[in-house]
């Protein structure tokens, strides 16, 4: 009860701040501090590169970015914007979709030259696997579609040669020929285009999609400093090629 009251009180105070900012905006450009929460890899590769242009356009802004792979309480922790994976239901938040992230199984040409490219999911039993462990302790499962349309699941953690938590580290390990890893297309894109990674089992692999969203507190008045930041981030992320690669465009990168 007390936490709920404090959360509602914070929303009310922030609405008051927004009203003050709106009045000020009638006389001046957007200015002030904007606090953003985002995950480490996505924030570094996609959010951070979008900020110089924003700051160049609005020099009165001060952007504070926290890189955190945990799910934060945007209202309680005082964030203006969160860029994160998964649509977390919360009546106090507005959710704007950014993209749907796809994943692929990859290995380096050197690894494939030494061990061969698996032609069926069952053949993975003879290969070196790199697994990802989430902060919750769970290991990411690999899903495959059989000829009859059924879905089979492989737990790479049972026999992984290497288990990592940071998604970008799986890409690096695959590039270093440690083994086969499931990674986000947006993380592997440059390596696929350069030829340093190849996609395997593309016709069988069924990774599903992971939705990236921008969320911000639901309020009647949104401060101009937050409005311009939201607009800029949505436009920048919509134009980010790596985040919108269609799956049928990946066939040319298959082993």
Where does each model-flagged region fall?
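Alpha-helical "hinge/linker" immediately C-terminal to small N-terminal DNA-binding modules
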Residues: 1-25
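Central regulatory/effector-binding core of bacterial HTH transcription factors
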Residues: 31-94, 246-255
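Short, well-ordered beta-strand segments
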Residues: 35-37, 82, 130, 181, ...
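Acidic, Gly/Pro-rich loop/turn segments at junctions of secondary structure
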Residues: 57, 66-164
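Paired acidic/hydrophobic, glycine-rich loop segments that form the ligand-binding mouth/hinge
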Residues: 81-84, 179-183, 199-200
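Ligand-binding "clamshell"
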Residues: 90-97, 191-201
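A ligand-binding cleft/hinge motif common to bilobed small-molecule-binding domains
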Residues: 171-196
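C-terminal effector-binding regulatory domain of bacterial HTH transcription factors
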Residues: 189-190, 194, 204-255
């Amino acid at each position: 009860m007390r936490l709920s009251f404090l959360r509602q009180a914070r929303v009310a105070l922030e609405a008051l701040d927004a009203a003050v900012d709106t009045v000020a905006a009638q006389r001046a450009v957007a200015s002030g501090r904007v606090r953003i929460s985002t995950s480490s890899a996505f924030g570094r590769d996609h959010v951070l590169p979008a900020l110089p242009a924003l700051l160049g356009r609005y020099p009165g802004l001060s952007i504070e970015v926290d890189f955190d792979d945990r799910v934060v309480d945007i209202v309680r922790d005082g964030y203006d914007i969160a860029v994160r994976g998964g649509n977390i239901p919360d009546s106090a938040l507005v959710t704007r979709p950014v993209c749907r992230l796809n994943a692929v199984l990859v290995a380096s040409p050197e690894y494939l030259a030494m061990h061969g490219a698996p032609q069926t999911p069952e053949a993975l039993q003879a290969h070196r696997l790199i697994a990802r462990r989430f902060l919750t302790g769970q290991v990411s499962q690999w899903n495959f579609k059989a000829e009859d349309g059924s879905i089979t699941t492989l737990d790479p953690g049972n026999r992984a040669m290497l288990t990592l938590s940071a998604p970008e580290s799986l890409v690096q390990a695959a590039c270093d020929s440690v083994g086969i890893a499931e990674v986000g297309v947006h993380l592997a894109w440059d390596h696929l285009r350069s030829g340093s990674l190849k996609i395997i089992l593309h016709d069988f692999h069924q990774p599903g999609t992971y939705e990236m969203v921008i969320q911000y507190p639901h309020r009647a008045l949104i401060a101009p400093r937050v409005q311009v930041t939201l607009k800029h981030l949505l436009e920048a992320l919509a134009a980010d090629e790596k985040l919108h690669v269609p799956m049928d465009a990946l066939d040319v990168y298959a082993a």
